[in-house]
C-alpha cells in the first residue's frame, strides 16, 4: 500500500486477498470485488456492493463509488480522501438485500488511519448503509 498523500496501488496478483477480506473470507480480489470495480459484473447482493465500495475506498476508485451511488443522494465528487488509509472491514449485520430483494441494509465497521498534517490518527466508521435496486442494479442510497 502506498504512503499517505498518494493513491494506493491496486493489488496485481490474482491471488491477493480482496481488501474487503473476501467473501467468503480470504477470497482473492480477482474473484471477489475486482470484477465489480472493473464493471465486468454487477453485485448480486447489497452486501457484495457494500464490500466492493469499501474496496473502492481502499484502492482509491472514485469511479466505482460514483457509479454505485444513487443519483438522488450522491455528491458530485466521489473520490476518496487520499489522506485516509482504510485498514479493516467487519460486516456486523445484513438485513434483506438478497438476490430477490428490492432493498437492504448492511451494518459494518471500517477501521482507518490518517496522517492529516499532524500526528497519526486512528478511528473507525460504524454505519448502517441503505441499498436499493435501481434499474435492476444495487446502488448505495445512504446511511441510516
Question: Where are the model-predicted features located?
Answer:
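Intrinsically disordered, low-complexity linkers and tails
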Residues: 1-10, 98, 130
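Small disulfide-bonded, cysteine-rich extracellular recognition modules and tandem repeats
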Residues: 21-23, 35, 134
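Cysteine-rich micro-motifs
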Residues: 28-36
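Core segments of small alpha/beta cavity-forming domains
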Residues: 35-82
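Short Cys/His-rich zinc-binding micro-motifs
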Residues: 3, 14-27
Amino acid at each position: 500500500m502506498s504512503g499517505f498523500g498518494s493513491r494506493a496501488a491496486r493489488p496485481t496478483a490474482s491471488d491477493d486477498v480482496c481488501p474487503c477480506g473476501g467473501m467468503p473470507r480470504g477470497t482473492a480480489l480477482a474473484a471477489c470485488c475486482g470484477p465489480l470495480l472493473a464493471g465486468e459484473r454487477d453485485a448480486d447482493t447489497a452486501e457484495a456492493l457494500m464490500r466492493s465500495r469499501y474496496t473502492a475506498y481502499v484502492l482509491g476508485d472514485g469511479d466505482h463509488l460514483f457509479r454505485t451511488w444513487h443519483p438522488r443522494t450522491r455528491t458530485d465528487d466521489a473520490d476518496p480522501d487520499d489522506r485516509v488509509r482504510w485498514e479493516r472491514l467487519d460486516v456486523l449485520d445484513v438485513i434483506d438485500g438478497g438476490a430477490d430483494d428490492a432493498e437492504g441494509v448492511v451494518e459494518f465497521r471500517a477501521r482507518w488511519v490518517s496522517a492529516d498534517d499532524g500526528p497519526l490518527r486512528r478511528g473507525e466508521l460504524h454505519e448502517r448503509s441503505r441499498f436499493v435496486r435501481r434499474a435492476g442494479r444495487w446502488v448505495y442510497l445512504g446511511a441510516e
